[in-house]
A protein has these predicted regions:
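Structural preference for beta-strand elements that scaffold enzyme active sites
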Residues: 13-17, 49-50, 80-86, 126-130, ...
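Surface-exposed, active-site-proximal loop segments in enzymatic domains
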Residues: 64, 91-105
């Protein structure tokens, strides 16, 4: 397996990680536990060393289900893998169906309670990479970073990061406690966070790309006939999965198909290889429940594009019509 180092840290991870959210959250009913255990064990055997979860990736009945399953499945391989999890948000009215608004809460006492819960559920004495899941505008970045510094000194976390950060927030937090990685949405259909690349390079911060296949649509395994449960699967409401979007994205899909033919690869592999060819510190974390997709995704690490090819792809992307893409759950501000 090919490895990458996140920024200037000493944290080495597999060039492609595994986003575990969809195993139990947002993509239909949770997968069968035995299937998840098998999938994660196979991922380790294939060379995956980087696994991403969060304290809220569960169900209304068990909001911490994802961490529990990831912790159990990876316990036999704990010294071989890097586990990333997240703190700092809760769902508004999680008992209701559909995509729930998020309530940020990064007060120090909340963070400390969260880290203890995650350590217990993940069956570990330390978290390799601990992300602030969403920015809490009621808590200054310096306060969050200071809490992270304390947790690092206590050995409860080894590195920390920020998900969906801005440049100003990253700079302020990094000044207090160096940030190892940011985790933001990034794909051929969602390139707005490329604006962070210069500051990531300057500060030596890695970039972890979530939804690198635009919630699966760039795998080109779906079409206008694909159906999703509106009660349990966020894709039912995502703009890129609406019928008119498939027509709007036709040129994009055709370009990816052509690149796949040229590289003797799949559309998903092309999408992942494109971003990995941009910077050596970009690590995508696509999710899947299928062993075949698991193997396919990690195979993207063996495919590369030259910088001229990357520039040509970027130019084409900028010139073509592309549908909107799901940009994340709505954030609501509630008094703490």
């Amino acid at each position: 397996m090919i490895f990458r180092t996140l920024g200037k840290s000493n944290l080495q991870v597999s060039a492609v990680g595994l986003g575990c959210m969809g195993l139990s959250h947002a993509y239909g009913a949770p997968a069968d536990k035995e299937d998840i255990m098998t999938l994660l064990a196979n991922a380790v055997d294939m060379g995956y060393t980087f696994f991403d979860t969060a304290e809220i990736y569960g169900t209304p009945d068990n909001p911490h289900l994802n961490e529990e399953m990831v912790g159990e499945a990876l316990a036999p391989y704990r010294n071989k893998v890097v586990i990333a999890t997240k703190f700092g948000i809760r769902f508004d009215h999680p008992e209701l169906p559909g995509n729930h608004p998020l309530i940020p809460d990064s007060r120090p006492e909340i963070i400390r309670a969260a880290v203890e819960g995650s350590l217990r559920r993940l069956r570990t004495d330390h978290i390799d990479l601990y992300y602030q899941h969403r920015i809490d505008k009621n808590v200054e970045p310096e306060v969050v970073a200071d809490t992270m510094s304390e947790l690092i000194k206590e050995g409860k976390i080894l590195h920390w990061g920020i998900s969906e950060t801005t440049e100003q927030y990253l700079r302020r937090a990094h000044e207090v406690c160096p940030v190892t990685a940011v985790q933001n949405r990034y794909s051929m259909m969602a390139r707005w966070h490329e604006s962070l690349f210069p500051v990531c390079k300057e500060l030596g911060v890695g970039f972890v790309a979530f939804s690198p296949l635009a919630n699966g649509v760039l795998s080109e395994c779906y079409n206008t006939e694909s159906k999703f449960d509106a009660q349990t699967d966020y894709r039912a409401a995502m703009p890129q999965y609406q019928k008119d979007s498939f027509e709007k994205n036709k040129c994009l899909f055709e370009m990816i198909e052509q690149l796949a033919m040229e590289k003797h690869a799949t559309p998903a592999q092309v999408s992942l290889a494109w971003m990995m060819s941009k910077k050596p510190w970009i690590v995508p974390i696509p999710g899947t429940r299928c062993l075949c997709r698991l193997k396919e995704n990690i195979g993207a690490a063996d495919i590369s594009f030259s910088q001229d090819e990357v520039m040509a792809i970027d130019k084409a992307l900028s010139s073509m019509g592309i549908s909107d893409v799901f940009g994340g759950s709505r954030i609501v501000d509630k008094a703490q």
